[in-house]
């Protein structure tokens, strides 16, 4: 069918008469709802194949005839009024209704063109028949059988058209064929079929031929029965193999033990036979040869002992060398630390030199003692007594010249007091024992206590006090003195 625009429908009068000259139903024009169907002379095959346009002769039979020209004019007037209302309503309709309207109007346009010619022919023949055009539809189809009903009877469809006999349509015979098993297929389309029983392979069990397998070709082999029997057989085989493995291991271990015991017995027998043979040879050999052999054996033993001793001596010497290096390194570190400490305390370089000299002498004395301790006894006896006397006299002379550090208490402000030494000595003796009390300067009297705590207590107790009308000041000072030289 050809499509015609809606404007052609609205501008062209319709020559169709409706019963009672009533208003045109919009649903009738738009194709919605139930539409009365009238019989046609078309066959059902022509109705189903509606893709081709209707012939002019068929449309003449379906279009109603007009009986009166006055009625045509009245219908035209009423159609014009209805067209205005339809135009207003179609502006508000959605896209779906417009499509249906265009489809229906295209069919009506063709029918109206043919209706004019039909009216002229009918007027000539004097036939006055009023019919409403009917459009066959598939809504009249009914299903004879319930598809949900079980059974093998085919499903039929009845097509009812007014004026035509009912026609029943059945599906093709292939639709009712029994369903076949779905054959699995490979991605390339080859079906999977069962492999014959002769395709068994060694190593897959006794019943490998009876197992279900899939292969290319379609179908599936039957599933084997008697799974319990197969499982029991498998378990029996595994237990038998395990017991067989244990037996073989036991036999191997027993064979190993027997072999080891036999080898031990052979070695013992060889050693015993060798020792017996050696004793027999020693009895047969002359005494001189035996003594010479024993001497050689003793010499080798002594040589090994000497080697071990030399090795131990070398190791001991290396240890002593390492220890001497460590001692020297520690001495250097202590010397540097002592110098830094003395500088931090504000001591003079002379004091630091004296301390280092004393340390060096002490180290020298310790070294000589170690040498005498490790020296042989003969060398100790050869040391003359004169050396000892000389060393003792030199030590006595050094002790006279050597000074010692003391913590002295200085009392100042006693220049105008002649008996200041006696008075201060008496006061210090009351506090604790003293080593020395003397006038170190015209205005200073110095005291050395046996204990440093007493010197501190004296300073705290008498500093700033008045002695015989004179205010004295007490302070502490570290002095390097030789008390034998102090008057």
Curated annotation (Swiss-Prot):
Regions of biased composition (Low complexity) lie at 254-264, 385-395
Q: Spans of biased composition, class Basic residues?
A: 241-253
Q: Which domain of life is it from?
A: Eukaryota
Acidic residues compositional bias, start-end: 54-96
Q: Where is the segment annotated Disordered?
A: 35-153, 237-345, 358-395
Q: Where is the composition biased (Basic and acidic residues)?
A: 97-132, 273-338, 358-383
Q: What is this protein called?
A: Uncharacterized protein ZK643.5
């Amino acid at each position: 069918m050809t499509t015609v625009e809606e404007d052609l429908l609205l501008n062209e009068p319709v020559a169709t008469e409706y019963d009672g000259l009533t208003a045109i139903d919009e649903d009738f024009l738009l194709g919605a709802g139930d539409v009365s169907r009238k019989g046609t002379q078309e066959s059902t095959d022509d109705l189903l194949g509606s893709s081709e346009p209707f012939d002019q002769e068929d449309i003449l039979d379906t279009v109603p005839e007009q009986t009166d020209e006055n009625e045509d004019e009245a219908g035209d007037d009423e159609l014009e009024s209805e067209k205005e209302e339809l135009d207003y309503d179609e502006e508000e309709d959605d896209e779906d209704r417009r499509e249906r309207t265009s489809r229906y109007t295209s069919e009506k346009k063709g029918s109206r063109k043919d209706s004019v010619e039909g009216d002229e022919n009918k007027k000539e023949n004097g036939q006055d028949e009023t019919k409403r055009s009917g459009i066959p539809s598939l809504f009249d189809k009914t299903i004879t059988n319930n598809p949900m009903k079980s059974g093998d009877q085919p499903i039929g469809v009845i097509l009812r058209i007014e004026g035509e006999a009912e026609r029943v349509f059945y599906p093709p015979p292939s639709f009712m064929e029994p369903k076949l098993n779905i054959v699995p297929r490979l991605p390339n389309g080859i079906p999977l079929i069962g492999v014959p029983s002769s395709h068994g392979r060694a190593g897959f069990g006794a019943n490998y031929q009876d197992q279900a397998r899939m292969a290319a070709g379609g179908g599936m082999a039957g599933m084997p029965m008697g799974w319990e029997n197969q499982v029991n057989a498998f378990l029996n085989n595994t237990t038998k193999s395990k017991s067989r493995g244990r037996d073989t291991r036991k036999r191997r271990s027993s064979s190993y033990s027997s072999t080891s015991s036999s080898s031990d017995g052979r070695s013992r027998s060889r050693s015993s036979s060798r020792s017996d043979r050696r004793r027999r040879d020693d009895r047969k050999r002359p005494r001189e040869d035996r003594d010479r052999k024993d001497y050689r054996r003793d010499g080798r033993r002594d040589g090994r002992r000497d080697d071990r001793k030399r090795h131990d001596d070398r190791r001991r010497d290396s240890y002593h060398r390492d220890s001497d290096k460590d001692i020297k390194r520690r001495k250097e570190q202590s010397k540097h630390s002592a110098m830094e400490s003395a500088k931090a305390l504000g001591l003079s370089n002379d004091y630091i030199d004296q301390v280092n000299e004393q340390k060096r002498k002490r180290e020298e004395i310790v070294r000589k003692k170690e040498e005498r301790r490790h020296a042989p006894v003969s060398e100790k006896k050869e040391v003359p007594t004169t050396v000892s006397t000389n060393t003792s006299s030199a030590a006595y002379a050094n002790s006279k010249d050597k000074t010692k550090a003391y913590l002295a208490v200085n009392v100042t402000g006693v220049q105008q007091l002649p008996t200041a030494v006696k008075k201060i000595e008496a006061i210090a003796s009351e506090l604790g024992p003293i080593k020395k009390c003397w006038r170190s300067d015209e205005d200073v009297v110095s005291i050395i206590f046996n204990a440093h705590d007493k010197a501190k207590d004296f300073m705290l107790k008498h500093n700033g006090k008045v002695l015989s009308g004179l205010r004295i000041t007490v302070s502490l000072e570290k002095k390097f003195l030789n008390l034998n030289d102090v008057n």
